Amino acid sequence: MKWLIILGVLGMIGWAISSTMTAMNTKTTTVYAGKAILQAQVADNDALRQKGLGGRSSIGRDAAMIFVFDKDGDLPMWMKDMETSIDIIWLNDKKKVVHVENNVEPDFEPHEVYRSPMPARYVLETRAGTAKKFGIKPGLSVRFELEDQK
């Protein structure tokens, strides 16, 4: 019985380390959106998408995160653990902007959920004000490459 408990604890520790390492192994890509050139972390798995930009007290002027999903759909986003305002930009499978939420502020429980009225494949999160500053709006084509698309 004692060994089963020890094995269970070791298994949980291994799972936690694996999840943390997956979240830390972040890929990056350059995103060209309007007049903006952004260096984006790629969130292409559940662990990275759940963490998102949460816990960061600031976001650099040319920093972003691109959330990658397997198929188009309703991609709800929330501000869990966010400490700074952001712009949320939804893109379809052709990497065309379908919706923008400007200057979304951090919130507390219960978290407000933000959605695009159109199906999307990607979500780009940037520092608040980036979309307006660089003319990122619905209809704009965005360019970026992902490792599995090269």
Give the ranges of each region predicted by the language model:
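Compact, glycine-rich, soluble single-domain proteins
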Residues: G14-K150
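Hydrophobic membrane-insertion alpha-helices, especially the h-region
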Residues: K2-S18
